[in-house]
C-alpha cells in the first residue's frame, strides 16, 4: 500500500530551524503582526512576483477578504454573481456566500478538473461580475483564455490558488500573479504548509492591498481607529516564521512532487482510474 502524506516526515527536517525561529519569537516578544509576518509577506510577494502580499488567518478568509475589499471599493455589491468551479473545496462557495455574493457553479473539463472553456464561453448573465478559477491539484487554469473573456465581459478575476503554491502559468508567471488578486491557504497538507492554519492574499492593486490589511485587523490601520467593519484574521507570527523557512525549499519540493506524478502517469494504465491531465512544466 502506498502511504498517505506524512506531515511529520516533511516537517522533521526543519526541527532545528523551527526551534531557532521559536527562540527568536520568544526573545522579540512580538506576538501579533510582527517582523516575522512582515518578512514572510515580503518573501512571498517576491516569490509570486507581486507587489503586495497580506497574511491572513486561512485560505477561506483570504477569499472572503478579497470580495469584501472589492465591495468597499465599489467593484462588487451584495447580490452580484461569481462564477466558480463546480469541482472545488467548499471554502470557495463559503467565501462567496459569506461576502453576500451569489455563487454560480460551472462544470469543469474532466481532463483537467479546471474550468471547461466551452461552458465558460457559453455563460450569458449580466449579473455575473467576477470569475474565480481554482488551480486544482497544482495545475494552473487556462488563464490566457480566461483573461480574454473576462476583459470582454468586464469581470474581475480572482485566483483560488490554495493548491498552487509555485505553479507556473502564462508567460512564466507564477500562480498568485495571474489575476487581479489571488488567495492562498497554508493548511498543513498544502505543498507550502504551516504547522497550523494560515493564508495570504497577493495582488498588484495598492488600494485592495491596503484595504485587506485593514480588514484582517478589525478594520484598523492604526490603534483605536477602525476605518472599516473588519474581521480578526491575521497570519500568526510563529506560523509566518515557519513558512519563511519552508518557502526556501518550495521549488525543490514541487519538482519532487512533479516527478512522482510523472511516475503515476507513466505506470498507471487502468481505464477505471482517471488521473488529471499531466502538466509537468509547472
Where would I find each of the regions flagged by the language model?
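N-terminal "arm"/small-domain region of PLP-dependent enzymes with the aminotransferase-like
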Residues: 1-30, 35
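Hydrophobic "anchor" residues on beta-strands that sit immediately upstream
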Residues: 2, 81, 155-156
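Pyridoxal 5′-phosphate
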Residues: 13-16, 76, 257
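Phosphate-binding glycine-rich loop
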Residues: 30, 34-81, 87, 94-98, ...
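Structural detector of well-ordered beta-strand residues that form the stable sheet scaffold
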Residues: 83, 104, 157-158, 183, ...
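Active-site phosphate-binding strand-loop segment of PLP-dependent enzymes
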Residues: 111-194, 200-202, 207
Amino acid at each position: 500500500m502506498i502511504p498517505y502524506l506524512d506531515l511529520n516526515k516533511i516537517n522533521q527536517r526543519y526541527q532545528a530551524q523551527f526551534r531557532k525561529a521559536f527562540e527568536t519569537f520568544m526573545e522579540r516578544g512580538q506576538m501579533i503582526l510582527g517582523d516575522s509576518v512582515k518578512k514572510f509577506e515580503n518573501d512571498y510577494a517576491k516569490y509570486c512576483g507581486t507587489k503586495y502580499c497580506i497574511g491572513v488567518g486561512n485560505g477561506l478568509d483570504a477569499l472572503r477578504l478579497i470580495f469584501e475589499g472589492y465591495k468597499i471599493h465599489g467593484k462588487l455589491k451584495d447580490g452580484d454573481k461569481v462564477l466558480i468551479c463546480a469541482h472545488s473545496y467548499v471554502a470557495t462557495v463559503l467565501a462567496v456566500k459569506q461576502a453576500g455574493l451569489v455563487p454560480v457553479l460551472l462544470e469543469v473539463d474532466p481532463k483537467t478538473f479546471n474550468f471547461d472553456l466551452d461552458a465558460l464561453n457559453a455563460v450569458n448573465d449580466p449579473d455575473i461580475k467576477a470569475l474565480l478559477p481554482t488551480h486544482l491539484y497544482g495545475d494552473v487554469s487556462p488563464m490566457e483564455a480566461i483573461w480574454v473573456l473576462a476583459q470582454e465581459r468586464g469581470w474581475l478575476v480572482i485566483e483560488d490558488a490554495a493548491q498552487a503554491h509555485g505553479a507556473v502559468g502564462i508567460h512564466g508567471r507564477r500562480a498568485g500573479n495571474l489575476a487581479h488578486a489571488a488567495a492562498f491557504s497554508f493548511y498543513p497538507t498544502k505543498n507550502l504548509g504551516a504547522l497550523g492554519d494560515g493564508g495570504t492574499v497577493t495582488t498588484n492593486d495598492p488600494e485592495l492591498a491596503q484595504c485587506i490589511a485593514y480588514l484582517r485587523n478589525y478594520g484598523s490601520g492604526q490603534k483605536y481607529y477602525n476605518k472599516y467593519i473588519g474581521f480578526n484574521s491575521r497570519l500568526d507570527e510563529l506560523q509566518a516564521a515557519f513558512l519563511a523557512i519552508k518557502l526556501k525549499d518550495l521549488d525543490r519540493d514541487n519538482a519532487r512532487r512533479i516527478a512522482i506524478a510523472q511516475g503515476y502517469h507513466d505506470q498507471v494504465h487502468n481505464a477505471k482510474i482517471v488521473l488529471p491531465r499531466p502538466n509537468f512544466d509547472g
